[in-house]
């Protein structure tokens, strides 16, 4: 089984990626 440290890092990385994607999408001018 993977250590708790890595297991805790996974759920934290997901929200960060989603937030970055949404931020880039908002910054991008809509056609």
UniProtKB/Swiss-Prot annotation:
GO (cellular component) term, any one: cytoplasm
GO biological process, one term: glycerol biosynthetic process
Cofactor (UniProt): pyridoxal 5'-phosphate
Major place of residence: cytoplasm
Catalytic activity: L-aspartate + 2-oxoglutarate = oxaloacetate + L-glutamate; L-cysteine + 2-oxoglutarate = 2-oxo-3-sulfanylpropanoate + L-glutamate; (2S)-2-aminobutanoate + 2-oxoglutarate = 2-oxobutanoate + L-glutamate; 3-sulfino-L-alanine + 2-oxoglutarate = 3-sulfinopyruvate + L-glutamate
Enzyme class, broadest EC rank: transferase
Molecular functions per Gene Ontology: L-aspartate:2-oxoglutarate aminotransferase activity; L-cysteine transaminase activity
Note: In eukaryotes there are cytoplasmic, mitochondrial and chloroplastic isozymes.
Function: Biosynthesis of L-glutamate from L-aspartate or L-cysteine. Important regulator of levels of glutamate, the major excitatory neurotransmitter of the vertebrate central nervous system. Acts as a scavenger of glutamate in brain neuroprotection. The aspartate aminotransferase activity is involved in hepatic glucose synthesis during development and in adipocyte glyceroneogenesis. Using L-cysteine as substrate, regulates levels of mercaptopyruvate, an important source of hydrogen sulfide. Mercaptopyruvate is converted into H(2)S via the action of 3-mercaptopyruvate sulfurtransferase (3MST).
Family under the similarity heading: Belongs to the class-I pyridoxal-phosphate-dependent aminotransferase family.
Assembly description: Homodimer.
Protein name: Aspartate aminotransferase, cytoplasmic
Record gene name: GOT1
């Amino acid at each position: 089984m993977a250590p708790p440290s890595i297991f805790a890092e996974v759920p934290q990385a997901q929200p960060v990626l989603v937030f970055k994607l949404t931020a880039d999408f908002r910054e991008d001018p809509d056609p």
